[in-house]
From Swiss-Prot:
Family to which the UniProt record says this protein belongs: Belongs to the bacterial ribosomal protein bS20 family.
Originating species: Citrifermentans bemidjiense (strain ATCC BAA-1014 / DSM 16622 / JCM 12645 / Bem) (Geobacter bemidjiensis)
Stretches assigned to coiled coil: none
Role played: Binds directly to 16S ribosomal RNA.
Region Disordered, annotated ranges: 1-27
Gene label: rpsT
Compositionally skewed regions (Basic and acidic residues) per UniProt: 16-27
Pfam families given in the database record: Ribosomal_S20p
SUPFAM superfamilies: Ribosomal protein S20
The protein's name: Small ribosomal subunit protein bS20
Length: 87
């Protein structure tokens, strides 16, 4: 356990940030999953709509530092390629 006031504050801040980041990461995964599910059902319109919603969420997570910017770019690229395979 922390002995200093500042260390205790840091522990609280870290816990709060961890919870916030968990929620953001979970939301991110949900939107990515929606795109993949739409592609799996071969519904091109739904896949494009899901991708249009997912891209800003992915970019926002990169901006907030939840994921690395390279990870965000890779996700967007792969999902876009996946949706484009539908025709």
């Amino acid at each position: 356990m922390a002995n200093h006031k500042s260390a205790m504050k840091r522990i609280k801040q870290t816990a709060k940030r961890t919870e916030r980041n968990k929620h953001e990461r979970s939301t991110l995964r949900t939107f990515i999953k929606r795109v993949r599910e739409a592609v799996a059902t071969k519904d091109q319109e739904a896949a494009k709509a899901a991708l249009a919603v997912a891209i800003p969420v992915i970019d926002g997570a990169a901006t907030k530092g939840i994921i690395h910017s390279s990870n965000a770019s890779r996700n967007v690229s792969r999902l876009t390629k996946l949706v484009n395979t539908l025709g």
